[in-house]
């Protein structure tokens, strides 16, 4: 069982960071309470401002809270959840151990690792850490995406359970492709 610290959703809003012009983003996500329907495109109340930030193969963004430690010297206080705009903040799920095609149960749903996550400049702008995107990319600690195999309800207290491993003769980890 993989502990889920938070399942978060966001609404599109206009954000202003530093010298950047105002932008549309749903980067500021907050944990939902109770249960929510997860369909092929993601959590029904979650929004994405840009086409490449969602879709069938990027329905859920996942990031390990243990990876927040990469930035402990850059920030006065690390966030408790959704630091990088992820939907699932898990306690620890290392990109080297996460394989494309791995399937997990989350509540009533089945989700499958489907894509790498390429860090966005908006995260760098939010935290005013000049090398944040480069640091994430070079570390291989970028998070990843799930597609939804089986739709259903997810409760705020649900955890992830690995139910099917990717085929061993062809599997690639998220870290392999980062």
Question: Residues of each region from the PLM?
Answer:
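Glycine-rich active-site loops that engage anionic ligands at enzyme catalytic sites
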Residues: 100-150
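Structural motif
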Residues: 102, 152-159
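Acidic and generally charged, gly/proline-rich low-complexity regions
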Residues: 115, 159-160
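Electropositive, beta-rich accessory/interaction domains or terminal extensions
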Residues: 1-122, 167-178
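A structural micro-motif recognizing beta-strand termini
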Residues: 91-94, 147-151
């Amino acid at each position: 069982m993989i502990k889920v610290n938070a399942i978060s959703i966001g609404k599109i809003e206009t954000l202003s960071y530093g010298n950047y012009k105002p932008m549309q983003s749903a980067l500021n996500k907050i944990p939902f309470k109770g249960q929510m329907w997860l369909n092929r495109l993601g959590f029904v109340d979650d929004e994405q401002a840009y086409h490449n930030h969602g879709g069938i193969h990027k329905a859920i963004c996942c990031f390990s809270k243990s990876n927040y430690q990469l930035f402990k010297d850059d920030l006065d206080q690390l966030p408790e959840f959704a630091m990088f705009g992820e939907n699932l903040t898990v306690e620890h799920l290392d990109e080297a151990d996460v394989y494309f095609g791995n399937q997990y149960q989350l509540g009533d749903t089945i989700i499958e690792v489907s894509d790498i996550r390429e860090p966005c400049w908006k995260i760098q702008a939010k935290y005013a850490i000049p090398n944040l995107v480069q640091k994430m990319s070079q570390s291989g600690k970028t998070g990843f995406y799930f597609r939804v195999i089986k739709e259903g309800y997810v409760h705020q207290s649900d955890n992830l359970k690995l139910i099917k491993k990717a085929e061993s003769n062809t599997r690639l980890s998220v870290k392999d492709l980062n």
